[in-house]
C-alpha cells in the first residue's frame, strides 16, 4: 500500500505557501496569528 504523504516541494508551496496564505482573509489571519505568536517560520 502506498503511503499518504508523498513529499513534493512544488505542491507544498502551492497549497501552504506564503502567497497562497495572503490571498484569502483566513490565510492572512493565519499569518497574523503566527506573527503574534512569534513563529520563526510564518509559512512553508
Swiss-Prot record:
GO terms for molecular function: structural constituent of ribosome. Pfam families: Ribosomal_L34 (PF00468). It comes from the Bacteria. GO terms for cellular component: ribonucleoprotein complex; ribosome. Keywords: Ribonucleoprotein, Ribosomal protein. InterPro entries: Ribosomal_bL34, Ribosomal_bL34_CS. GO terms for biological process: translation. Belongs to the bacterial ribosomal protein bL34 family. PANTHER family: LARGE RIBOSOMAL SUBUNIT PROTEIN BL34M, MITOCHONDRIAL RIBOSOMAL PROTEIN 34 FAMILY MEMBER. This is Large ribosomal subunit protein bL34. It comes from Albidiferax ferrireducens (strain ATCC BAA-621 / DSM 15236 / T118).
